[in-house]
Amino acid sequence: MRSHYCTELSEANIGQEVVLAGWANSYRDHGGIIFIDLRDKSGLIQLTCDPEDSASSHKIASSIRDEFVLVAKGKVRLRGEGLTNPRLKTGAIEIVVSELTIENRSAAVPFVIGDKNVGEETRLKYRYLELRDPSMYETFRLRSKAAIAARNILDENGFLEVETPILTKSTPEGARDYLVPSRVHSGEFYALPQSPQLFKQLLMVGGFDRYFQIAKCFRDEDLRADRQPEFTQIDVEMSFCNQEDVMLIAEKLLVSMFGACGVEIKPPFNRIAYRDAMEWYGSDKPDLRYDLKMVDVIDIFERCDNEIFTNIAKQPHKNRIKALRVPGADLVFSKREMKTFEDFVRQFGAQGLGYFQMKEDGLKGPLIKFFSDADIALLVDRLGMKVGDVVFFGAGDKKTVWDYMGRLRIFIAEHERMNLADKDAFEFVWVVDFPMFEVEDGRVKALHHPFTQPKDTDKDDIEEIDSIAYDIVLNGTELGGGSIRIHKEEMQEEIFKLLGIGEEEAKEKFGFLLDALKFGAPPHGGFAIGFDRLMMLISKKSSIRDVIAFPKTQKASCILTKAPSEVDATQLRDLHIKLR
C-alpha cells in the first residue's frame, strides 16, 4: 500500500512519486490550499492539497480531521522559500497530493498525540493513542533491538533459549506470589513465577550447560516508579563456571545490548565489595557518576568534648560516625537551606545532622567548640577540605547512618543547584562479596535467596558469612544480579536450617530441588537482568511504565482493560471459590 515511511524521504527524493500512509496529525486551510501533517511510526511529513493539482483530493482533504487514517499519493518537492520547518526531519520538503483516500475516520481524541502534559490516568486509559507518538515507537524499537542483540550474543556464546513454566508451585522468594486456582484440583493453587530460578537450576542438573530466557516474572508487591507486578528479565544460567565466568558473560551481554541502542560502553566494569559500598556510599547500589564518598571519623569524635558523640564512638562495632564532604556547597547553600537537610534525614531515622563550613579563616560550625585544634586540623586533612566546602556528619547505629547519609548523598548530588550526575553517562559497577544472611527482628534471612553458595559457613557471627553473589548497578539503579548456586544437597539442607526452614517444610516447598541435587548436579551459577529497568535507563525515561507497551498503574491495575475485575459466579463455582 505504501512506498515509503514519512521520514525516509528527503531532498534526494525530489520529483519522485510516492505513496504514504498514516494518520492526520494536524490540518490547516490556508486560502484554499489545505496542508495536512501526516504521521506514521517514523514521524511527520507535510501533505499539500491544492485544487489546481487535484480537485478531487482537495475535496476529500476538506473533510479530514485529526487522526483520520489516510493513504496519499503524490510527488516530493521542495517547500517554498521561507516555508521550511527546521524542527521536522522532513521540514525542507512536502508531498503534492494527486490521490487521497480516507481509510477510516476518528472520533474526537481525548488529547493531542505527543502532548506531554496529559495526566497519566488519561494516557493509560487511551494507551493505544499514546503509542501513536513516534517517540513512543522509537522507545519500543530500541527495546526490540536490545532483545535481538541479547539473543544473538547469547546464542554466539553457546546458550540455548528454553521456556520454563508460567503455572508453577508457590515458593515465595520474598514478595507475595500471584496465585491461580486450579479447577481440576479443588482447593489447590498454582503460582505465577517470581523468577525462573529453580527451573533454570534444574536445567543445569539436566545437562543443558548454558541456558537463557527473556522471561515474564510476577511479584505481588508494593509498586514504585521502577516496579511493575509483571516484568521482564533476561535470565541466564551456566554450568561448570565461577563468578568470573558469569560476570564476563553478563558484561558481553550488556555491551551488545547497549551497542544495539547506539550506546558504547567499555568493559571491564568497576567492582566494589558490599561492605565498602555501604561504608563509602551508604548503599549497595551506589551511583558512581559523582564521587561524594563518606569518610569514617569515629576515632576523632571519640576524643571530642560532647558526651553524645563519645558514647556513640565507644561502640565502633555497632555504631558509625560518618563525614560527607560536599565541595563548594558553602558557596551554593545558605545556612537555612543546610538546616533543611537535617529535616530530610530525620525522615530516615537520623537524630540530627551536624555540619562544618570551610571558610578563609578555617573550619566553622556549631560543633567546632567540642574539638581540639589538633583534631580540627586532622579533620581538615583527612577530608581534604578546601575553602567553600561543607562537611556533613551522621552518627548512630551503623545501618541507620548508612541509610540516611547515603540518601543525603543522592539528595545533594541531584539538587538543582548541584547537578553532580552527568545525565549522559552510564556508570556501571559490580557489587560483590554480599553477606549471605541478614538478621531482621531476630530472624535470619537470606540477603539474596537461599540457593546462593556461601563462601564459608565457619563463622561465629552469621552476618559475617559472605556469599558468592554479585549485583550489577548502573547509575544508582540495580539492573540485576546473580550468584554461584549451591549444587550439593547437604549444603542446601544446612542453609535451609540456618534460615529456620525445617526438614518437613523444606521437603514440602523444595523437595523437587533437593531430590535433583542428589543426582550429580554440576557446579553452576547465573544472573538475571531487569529488562524493563535497563530500557528505562537507556531511553532516559523516569518510569518503567514508559517502556512497557501496556503497563499497570501504581495500584497494580490496568485502566485500559479495567483489570483486575470481578468474574462470573459460574467461573468462581467451577474453581471451588466462595467470596466473603
Curated annotation (Swiss-Prot):
Keywords: Aminoacyl-tRNA synthetase, ATP-binding, Cytoplasm, Ligase, Nucleotide-binding, Protein biosynthesis. PROSITE patterns: AA_TRNA_LIGASE_II. The record marks H30, G82 as: Important for tRNA non-discrimination. Aspartyl-tRNA synthetase with relaxed tRNA specificity since it is able to aspartylate not only its cognate tRNA(Asp) but also tRNA(Asn). Reaction proceeds in two steps: L-aspartate is first activated by ATP to form Asp-AMP and then transferred to the acceptor end of tRNA(Asp/Asn). GO terms for molecular function: aspartate-tRNA ligase activity; aspartate-tRNA(Asn) ligase activity; ATP binding; nucleic acid binding. HAMAP family: Asp_tRNA_synth_type1. InterPro entries: Aa-tRNA-synt_II, aa-tRNA-synth_II, aa-tRNA-synth_II/BPL/LPL, Asp-tRNA-ligase_1, Asp-tRNA-ligase_1_N, Asp/Asn-tRNA-synth_IIb, AspRS_core, GAD-like_sf. It is an enzyme of class 6 (ligase). GO terms for biological process: aspartyl-tRNA aminoacylation. The keyword Plastid does not apply. Residues 197-200 are annotated as: Aspartate. The lineage of its organism: Bacteria, Pseudomonadati, Campylobacterota, Epsilonproteobacteria, Campylobacterales. This is Aspartate--tRNA(Asp/Asn) ligase. Its EC number is 6.1.1.23. It is found in: Cytoplasm. One of its GO terms (cellular component) is cytoplasm. Homodimer. It catalyses: tRNA(Asx) + L-aspartate + ATP = L-aspartyl-tRNA(Asx) + AMP + diphosphate. It comes from Sulfurimonas denitrificans (strain ATCC 33889 / DSM 1251) (Thiomicrospira denitrificans (strain ATCC 33889 / DSM 1251)). L-aspartate binds at E173, R219, H448, R485. The keyword Protein biosynthesis applies. It comes from the Bacteria. ATP binds at R219, D220, E221, Q228, E478, G530, F531, D532, R533. Belongs to the class-II aminoacyl-tRNA synthetase family. Type 1 subfamily. Signal peptide: none annotated.
